[in-house]
Every structure is written in structure tokens, then in C-alpha cells.
Amino acid sequence: MGARASVLSGGKLDKWEKIRLRPGGKKKYRLKHIVWASRELERYALNPGLLETSEGCKQIIGQLQPAIQTGTEELRSLYNTVATLYCVHKGIDVKDTKEALEKMEEEQNKSKKKAQQAAADTGNNSQVSQNYPIVQNLQGQMVHQAISPRTLNAWVKVIEEKAFSPEVIPMFSALSEGATPQDLNTMLNTVGGHQAAMQMLKETINEEAAEWDRLHPVHAGPIAPGQMREPRGSDIAGTTSTLQEQIAWMTSNPPIPVGEIYKRWIIVGLNKIVRMYSPVSILDIRQGPKEPFRDYVDRFYKTLRAEQASQDVKNWMTETLLVQNANPDCKTILKALGPQATLEEMMTACQGVGGPSHKARVLAEAMSQATNSVTTAMMQRGNFKGPRKIIKCFNCGKEGHIAKNCRAPRKKGCWRCGKEGHQLKDCTERQANFLRENLAFPQGKAGELSPKQTRANSPTSRELRVWGRDNPLSKTGAERQGTVSFNFPQITLWQRPLVAIKIGGQLKEALLDTGADDTVLEEMNLPGKWKPKMIGGIGGFIKVRQYDQIPIEICGQKAIGTVLVGPTPVNIIGRNLLTQIGCTLNFPISPIETVPVKLKPGMDGPKVKQWPLTEEKIKALTEICTDMEKEGKISRIGPENPYNTPIFAIKKKDSTKWRKLVDFRELNKRTQDFWEVQLGIPHPAGLKKKKSVTVLDVGDAYFSVPLDEDFRKYTAFTISSINNETPGIRYQYNVLPQGWKGSPAIFQSSMTKILEPFRKQNPEMVIYQYMDDLYVGSDLEIGQHRTKIEKLREHLLRWGFTRPDKKHQKEPPFLWMGYELHPDKWTVQSIKLPEKESWTVNDIQNLVERLNWASQIYPGIKVRQLCKLLRGTKALTEVIPLTEEAELELAENREILKEPVHGVYYDPSKDLIAEIQKQGHGQWTYQIYQEPFKNLKTGKYARMRGAHTNDVKQLAEAVQRISTESIVIWGRTPKFRLPIQKETWETWWAEYWQATWIPEWEFVNTPPLVKLWYQLEKEPIIGAETFYVDGAANRETKLGKAGYVTDRGRQKVVPLTDTTNQKTELQAINLALQDSGLEVNIVTDSQYALGIIQAQPDKSESELVNQIIEQLIKKEKVYLAWVPAHKGIGGNEQVDKLVSQGIRKVLFLDGIDKAQEEHEKYHNNWRAMASDFNLPPVVAKEIVASCDKCQLKGEAMHGQVDCSPGIWQLDCTHLEGKVILVAVHVASGYIEAEVIPAETGQETAYFLLKLAGRWPVKVVHTDNGSNFTSAAVKAACWWAGIKQEFGIPYNPQSQGVVESMNKELKKIIGQVRDQAEHLKTAVQMAVFIHNFKRRRGIGGYSAGERIIDIIATDIQTKELQKQIIKIQNFRVYYRDSRDPIWKGPAKLLWKGEGAVVIQDKSDIKVVPRRKVKIIRDYGKQMAGDDCVASRQDED
């Protein structure tokens, strides 16, 4: 922020902070507004450095001004901020933004007048930019430089990313600076794929050109010799003029700026396009001339959702504006459909409108109408009476008028079904019963269980059923429910449903078609009068004769109705006759295998009483349960069932309807545990890009899967009556209940089994399943893809899973799992942060949740300060005032979320790259991508695993977290780009190799860089003063002392209050650092203090540790050592006495000597000593810590043993007069041991080869024994490629690990010796126990598990190292800032976003990306600099 904050300084900053945002308002400009403005300028591709001067501000205003009229609120705010900043730079006194804008306008008017005056004086009234690509060559000729591919590429990216939003206009203006009409046309041609927008732009240019011709008429007579012709409108647009003419006009004296004029026309057109694509109001949404109706509807509803209006007003907008603002072709069709048409009907009717097929269809209809005009005229004269439609009122039921004109009081409820709670337009009856009357379904609705018949015995094919006459129909068909005889014909739909019919005494074959409204038969003679009629079908319009009241027999069932006769390719029985004979479509359900469920052993079902409910809740529950019982989801039970679970009801959000809830907590406690089949939700960044995508939602997911019959009794519940008027109605579930712990696991398992055959049959379809959400993607064409989707829906329906159309998303964007998916990108669904005056704990929790969700694609989100507000135990409703830091953090997050950010999809063929940046205050942000600037996903890391840490340690933790996340999503780890120098990392890693594993990475120069602020010395500093420090505190009084004694006779003790032993130890170190020189040796007896400081933290939650860190940074050299307490060590004993006087109770000191003696004999642990000798834990732990035999070297963070994955230590130990050869894997503690006949080189070499055959051995570390130094062992090492090293005492790579393991092995052998006859058997038993039955160290692994983990990690790391070598196959040619000659080739060391690091001979340089050309090393094929310079891009 430092660079941005430097825009204003001193008095100017004071002036800035006195200016009000609004006239008479309280808020004033602050530094944060400048920071915000600089970030916004980067978004608009403008240099934020321009804010530092008045001239720069003026340039920014010139770029922003053309887009102000159509720009967003953010653009206006940016313009206002820059205008105010300009006034401050110029020293113009203003009180508020409005006054600043007025002053700015005055300045602009003055500068315009000056420019006009200057033009009049010089005869040059041109406004042409001096930056246009017309340059003078050495011969003095004006030469045109074509617009560069880089500029065109930038323009294409602008259109792709901004999609004709207001930002497009200033970007176009900047990219086309000084361009000729030919250049401008090149720019327009590159985005010619946007046909609708280009059509609008073309119309605008034609209008402007015509206006130019009107205002600039052609002069009469011939053109004088040597004089140029004046440009016409088409010349300016570049259609009738050559490039040479355009250059001549632009460079003549006086010039005619045809490029600027044409650019102005284009900007006018872009403004119109922007208003259409980014409208401010719903009134501005208009369908483009070639825009598909579906795209227009998407834009209309997207804007409609944002409108601040009531639902009634929105309904009116939909009914009128949607049709009114459609293009002429669509409007004609929509008006013909009538006012009651549904949106689906509109979209179907307007599909393909505007294309050649549509025009051909319109022409065919016009011709058919022309040929039919005679018939129409006859009908109009009355020779033919057409069928008159009887108008009937929905409201009062009377004929002769419609409901809209009805004078009777409005009937309550729906006019179609009579039910209350919805209106006619929202009625679902129309969609559900497409057979025109309420025909009964013997198994209930599709996808629901019948109360009379379970799924197990249901038919397994889809069928068309025709009712028999022995089962008479009522008028509505309602009485049929539940009393149906199954003696009727069943026709499966695996083949065309062709049946024999009898009509007019003739036998014919006809197709039963539930999609046809009318019955149409091929040419035949029927008795009676007929009327001419035109009917439309898939093949077009045909003329037919209409016969009324014709008797017909279908499958033995008789019906009388209207029959049409004409040239039909197949005889069709339509719904007008199918309804009469009681034909129904049935969707039988395949049986889903039930999963057996049991209660936990020894437990019985729940017996919780039902609590009292209000009358309205009882009524609501009764109605819900009645419907569920009809659908077979629940069944009534008697008093024999002793179990019960309470139920209650809540109102649905924004609805008057009720929702039933069952409190299954008690049953969940008693039900067996389930293993969740799916452990997390799929992430869109892991999806591969697919050509066609569909998102489905399975309707009533749980209610489609049956519950184990033996378990159903435990789900019993009761609906009580008011005042106990009647006994309660008892039910139990037949299907998976909502809220029961087993439902998710059983549903997921059942759904996976059901989808498995479809997945096998259609391997090209990718199906992501999470609960009832299905994402289906493929690389098929959209038509083929949708065919497959229909097959999938049929497959699901066969198993009883319905698929609601309203949740079937066919077109992008797809809403899935909280994400918004587009064909080539994804984002999180719209996130709006609430604006509140006061914030409760619950509000802040919700806010943090939203920000965490957004952080997976919005880089830079921070929540640390907001989370700090939630520390401690607080009530959810408690109001929390926001700190200044939290307000700033929230404001920054709001800015980040203002601009929508998208992620891309995963490409398995490309590498994953993860880049991490440090944000400060312990917060890190990262992006995972495969191509620069196209993030797969982003995230943040802010976890502090301890109270004291440093940036390197946190960075390592962040890398490990990102690696785990990547393996979960993509199954592989990314390459890392980290803001830390290799030297810094190696320095820290050499000491703390056991902190964590980290994959291969490369350095990226992204400030702020991570560094180690200080380093501790490995050896005592010669000549430096040595401080022996100690501290003591009394637990009861909380009083303490801290002090030091030096080797030069100095000493100091300070009293402390409200302290602890640990604090006093740290305070003593702080005193020593404060009172010492630049170099100091410090000796402490505190393991706690040593552990904190040796980890080299650079931040801590403890103020005292932060003070120590500050002192350490000031020092040149610091050596820190530890000695055991109370051991009579000179300086330590002196300082211990100093700080203990009057503080420590010495009652327990009598037991220390006895405890030490006991420990030296038996090496008992600290817990045993604390119990047996009544010692404080800290003293007992120090006794163990001071025992060299109880310390396993290399296990603690302070260890210095080399623990590379391939290092083993070998040693011989003796037991029972026999030799045991022991090999220890240093990094894991894994042991291989064997009893050998003799301690010879031959036996040792044989053992070593066996070890190398089992494990990857790189280095063996041995002592100088004769068997290890023998020629046989050396030969074995040479053959197996093993390096042999020899140890000496106190060397960091000494024999400490294997010596310790020898003791451990002997200890275990002693424990199991009586179980084995031979020593060699006991040795192998002990090896097994040590390797697999003892857990210790980081992660609680056994030694066997740890060695496998280490080797696997090492293999992964080496693979990553190989990948990074690939970058060395490139060569770089580069230019210095002043020298235009290309230099090179140089070696590429690192490639970043803004710069590259190269090595040219011995020099290492950092060069901006724009000044380099990166190419592959093609050997001698590249001839010279000219060839290289012609290559425009390295990507």
C-alpha cells in the first residue's frame, strides 16, 4: 500500500481529507479512497502511477469520460475520485465532490477554448492523437504500421471477459489510439463472431455515415489538379477508400482525422450495445435482430430478478415487456400464440427464428394461405360454418364472457383446480394431467409408491394401459382410484403402439399417440357431412376433412368423436378418443434393493412422547400425512407398535405452506453407525471442460428409496388431536425419512448402484453425483447429448426417481452445489455482503462463512480481523462493535467481491501450478492454475498451529495444505511458486527438516518476500560475554524473579508480579538480550524457552516473545545453549540461587537425588517419578531430559542427525554371547536385525546386500569396527551403489540412533525372551514389535508405517524435480531498456508473470516479460536476430 499511499503527501493529504464526499455530508475523503482508485485503474488497464500528478489525472479523466453515460456506479465513483484528486494536485480549493466536478468542467471548457484558438492561429484544427501508427521513414514518406497482433489479442480478450459491459468503451478507446479506419475494421472483424452486436454496430455506422453525407455535400465540378477529394461517409468507414487515401487525409494540411471520426461512430454504436447487454432498467432489455430468443429470455429474467418491484409488477413486466421488446420476427409469433401462452411454448415457437429454415417456413405458410384464400372466402360468406368456440367464465362458470370481464365477486383459490394457495397461472394441474381429465393412476403419480402395491411386485416396463368396459368410468374418473380391475390390455412402449381399429365398417391399423390432440386417418369415405380444415404437424400443414360424431372401436372399446381424414403418413388415434376409452400412461417402477438396518446392540427403539401442537399445525400435519399415505411413503399402524418419535411443523420460507419435521435425535443415537460413501463434495475446479453439460436434480430423492421392512417400526410417529378429542393417528415410514442418520449413506449407495449400468453403457458421459444433484457432461454435440440425457432420465424414472423439469437445467449458467457453471468457466453463486449498522455474533459468523466460500475463486479475501471479534464465549445475539482493522478488512473484501471472478476447468494434459503470496498478519493467499491469469481455484491460509511461529514455517504448512487439497480434487500435487529465496529456505530446512514434507518448488519474486529475520549460531561465540539466565515464580502468590549472572562478574535480578515459571524464564532471556552487546552467549535451563527461540519465530501471540524477537533481530550473533537444572553447573547454580530466594518452596528438593538414582537404575518415565517421589512434573521431566540414555537423537526439533530417506546406521551388539547385527533407518527408526554366526566382513556384507534388496539404501553409517572396514563390505557397497561413512564421537552424524535402538531392541528382547527357545527367534519377535506395535513421534506412526511414507514422499519429490528441469529447454533473446538490438541467446532460469530471470554468460539478470522472446532450443535452425525478432509471442 506504500506506493499507492504516496500519491499525496504533507499539506495535500490534509486538503484531501477535508473534502466531503457529498455536499453537506459527514463523510470525507480518506487515504483508502486513493488505494481503491488505484486498484480500479488496474482493472481498466490504466496506470495507477498517473494519480501522482495533475497531468496524469487529466489523462485518466480523458479516458473515462466517454463511458460515463453508460457506465456503472463504480465507474462514476472512480471518475469523481480522480476529478477531486486533480483539484487537490492543482491547488484548487473545493469543499466537496460536486464542487470538484464543476471546477473540472470549467478547466475542460477553458482548455477546449485554448485548443480552438491555437488551431485557428496555426490553421491546424486537428484533434488527431500524436500516437497513431503512421510514422515518417528516412525518406520523409508517411508509412503505416499495421495494428499489432498483441493489440488485437488484447481487444479479443476484453470482449470475451467483459462481454460488452461499460468497461469495453474506454478499453476500445485506449487500444485504438490513432488507428486508421482500416485498423479499426480489423479490430471489429476479430470479434465478428458476436453477430447480434456487430449487426447493431453496422446499423449505427450506416446511420452516422448517412448523416455525414447530409452535412458534407459533394462540391459541384471537377477536382482541381493536386487537390484531394473530400471523404464520403463510406470512405470514413473504410469501405470505399484505400489505405493510402486514409493516410493522405490524416496527414494532409489541414488534416481530416478520418480515423478519429470513425472511432467516434463506433463508440456511439458500442454505447447502444452496452445499453442492451448491460441495461440499467428492464425497459432497456431488447432482443437483437439476430439474437436467439432463448438468450434474450435469459437476459430479460436476469435483469428482472434485480428489479426492485413487487411480484405483481414483475408478473406484468413478464406478460407485456417480454413480447413488446422482442424483435419483429419473434413478436409476430408471440402475438399469434396469445396472452395465455407459457414460457416453454414461447421458446419452442421461437426456436430458430431469423435463420434460413424459419424464413422458408414463413414463405411456405404464406403460399398455403394464398392457395386456400378461395376456401377462406367461402367460409367467410357463410357457405361453411366453422366450429365456434364456446366462451366460458372461469370465475362464475357462466357462458358468454371471460373471467377478466366477469362482474361477479372473485372466487377464492385457483380457477382450474379449485384449491387455495395459488392462482391459475401457477397451477400444476395442467402440466400433470395432460390427458385433459383427471384419469386415475393405479399406482399413484409417476415415481411414487402405491399404498396397495409395493415396488417389489410392480411391472418392470413402461406401459400404455387401456381400461376395460367392465370397469365403468365416472365423468372425472376419480372413483376409479384404488378399485381398478387389472383385466385390461397393456401395451408396452418398447415398440410403436399399433392397434387394430374398426371405423365405418372397415378394419384398419392405427397408432395410439398421446401427444396428438386429434384423430387423423388416411383417405377413406365416411358417411355424413364434413368441413374443410388445416392442421399443423412436424412435417408442415396438411388439408383434411373433419367428420363429427363418428363411431369407432379401439381394442374392443367403443367411442364416438371427431375424426379427420387426409393425406397422413400413418393413422393416428389422438387424445380426443383415447380419453373416452380410459387410456392412461403408466410409469412402473423397478424394485430398489433395500439395505438391512439394525439398532445398536443392546438398544431398543425410541419411546419419546409427542409434545402438544397448535390447531393449525395439527391440521397442516394431517393434510401432509394424508397425501404421503396416498403416495405410499408412510403407512398407518396400530397400538401394537410401542415406539414413537415427536413431530412438529414449520412454515416454509416466503410461503404460507407448512413443512413436516421429525425429531429423529433419539432414533439416531440408537441406530447403527454408517460409513459415509462420499466424504466430501465435488469441486468445479476438478471438472474437465466439456462441450455439453446438463444439471439434474432428482425429485423426492429420499422418498424414492424404500426403508428396510424390519426397521420401519422404529420410525413410528403420532399426530395428536386437539383436547385429546380422539386417539392420535399413528404412522410409520416406508421410505427413507428426512433427518434420519442412515438416509444419506443408503441413498448414495442406492443411487450409485442405479447409475452404474448407465455409466458402463455410456462411458463418454461424465456423471458427478452428490446426493440428489447430478452433473452430466460430455463432448458430444448438444443434440446427441440431450438424447443421452433423456435416456438417463428414463433410466432414473424406471427406478422410481422423478426428475422435475423446473430443476432440469439445460442451458448455462448451471446452478450446482452452490456454484455457477458456464461452458468454459465457473464461479460461486452471487455473494452479497449485508450492510448493517450493528453486527451480532451470528451476523459476523454468517459473514465469515460467506467470505470463506467466496475465497475459493476470489483471490485476496481476508477474515483474520473479523474472526478476532468472535474470540471468547459470546451469545449469538450479542452486538459486537467492529474494530477499525475489521472495518478496513470488510471494506477490502467488498471491493474484491464487486467484480465477478471466474475460474476455468481442469485440463489433465497440462501441469498444475500453485502460487502463494504473503498478505501480512499471518495470512496467505494462493492461486492454482494451468495457464497464467486463468485460475482453476484460489484460496487462503491463515492458520497458526502454535502461539509462536515464523513465515517459513507457516509457508511450509500452507504448501502442505494446498498439496492435500490438490490431491483430493485432481489426484496430483502442483508445482509450487513461492515468495522465498532458495538460500533462506535451505538455511531453515537444514535445521528443521522434520517440520513437514514439501514438494519441489521454484522462487517467484512477489513482494513481500519471506525471510528469516535472525539466525542462531551453532557453536559458542569466542570472546562474547556469556549470560546464565534463570527465572522462578510462586504458583500461589504469582510473584517471581528473573535474572542473569555473566562470566565477567555482572549480575541482575528483577522482581515480577502476576507471572509464571515459563514467563520468568523468557523474561530472563529478554534481560540478557537487552543488557548484552551485539554478540552474546546465553545459557538457560528451560526446555520451554529453548524450544520457542530455537524455532526462530518472527511473530507470536505473546507480547514478551515479540520483545525477544525484536532484540534478536538487533543482534549480530546469538548462541543459545541448554544445561540441566539443579546439577551444580557453575553459572546456572549461581543464578538459580539468586532468583529462588523468597520465591520457590524447597520442600520437594529432598526427593530429587533419590529420584535421579532411581532413574539411573531403571530409566522410569517422568510420570512414575512424579508419583513415587512427590515431584512437580516440570522437575521430573527435566530429570528425564538430562538423561542421555533416554533421549532418542533425531526425534526432536533440535536434533542434528542427517535423516535423508536413504541413510541407514549399522552396528553390532552382543547378547547371550552371540552377535546381533542391527540396521536402523535413521529417518523412521525402522529396524532390520539378525543374529550372525561371527562378527566378520563376509557375514556383514551378506547382511548388507539382503538389506539393499529390500529397501532403497543410499548411505550406510558405521563405526570403525574391523568387520565394517573390511574389503568384503567395501565391495558390497560398491556393487550396490551404496556410500559408506564412518562415525566419530559427537559428530552430528554419529552412531547415536543405532546405539539407542540397540538398547531399545535389547529391552524388548528381555520382555519376550521367555516366549522363544532360541535367541534368533526372540530377535525377530522384538523387531516385529518395534516396527509395527510401537507408535511414537510426529503423527503417531509406527516405524514400519513411517518408512513407507518417507519413501513414497521421496519418490513424489523426485518426480516433481524432473518436471521442473523442463524449463531449461528454452532460450531467451532480450533487449535492454535503451539498446534496441536483441541480445542472446541466454539461459532461462525462471519465468514469472511480469518478468523473467535469465543467465547471460556469467551474469544473472531480471528482464520484464515485454522485452524478451522465449523460444525452444531448436539448435542451429534459428539463423539470427532477424528471425527471432519476428516472433511476436512466447506463449
Curated annotation (Swiss-Prot):
Binding site for Zn(2+): 1159, 1163, 1187, 1190
Residue ranges constituting the Reverse transcriptase domain according to the UniProt record: 631-821
Catalytic activity: Specific for a P1 residue that is hydrophobic, and P1' variable, but often Pro; Endohydrolysis of RNA in RNA/DNA hybrids. Three different cleavage modes: 1. sequence-specific internal cleavage of RNA. Human immunodeficiency virus type 1 and Moloney murine leukemia virus enzymes prefer to cleave the RNA strand one nucleotide away from the RNA-DNA junction. 2. RNA 5'-end directed cleavage 13-19 nucleotides from the RNA end. 3. DNA 3'-end directed cleavage 15-20 nucleotides away from the primer terminus; 3'-end directed exonucleolytic cleavage of viral RNA-DNA hybrid; DNA(n) + a 2'-deoxyribonucleoside 5'-triphosphate = DNA(n+1) + diphosphate
Regulation: Protease: The viral protease is inhibited by many synthetic protease inhibitors (PIs), such as amprenavir, atazanavir, indinavir, loprinavir, nelfinavir, ritonavir and saquinavir. Use of protease inhibitors in tritherapy regimens permit more ambitious therapeutic strategies. Reverse transcriptase/ribonuclease H: RT can be inhibited either by nucleoside RT inhibitors (NRTIs) or by non nucleoside RT inhibitors (NNRTIs).
Ranges annotated as DNA-binding: 1370-1417
SMART domains in the record: ZnF_C2HC
Name of the molecule in the record: Gag-Pol polyprotein
Organism of origin: Human immunodeficiency virus type 1 group M subtype D (isolate ELI) (HIV-1)
Gene name of the record: gag-pol
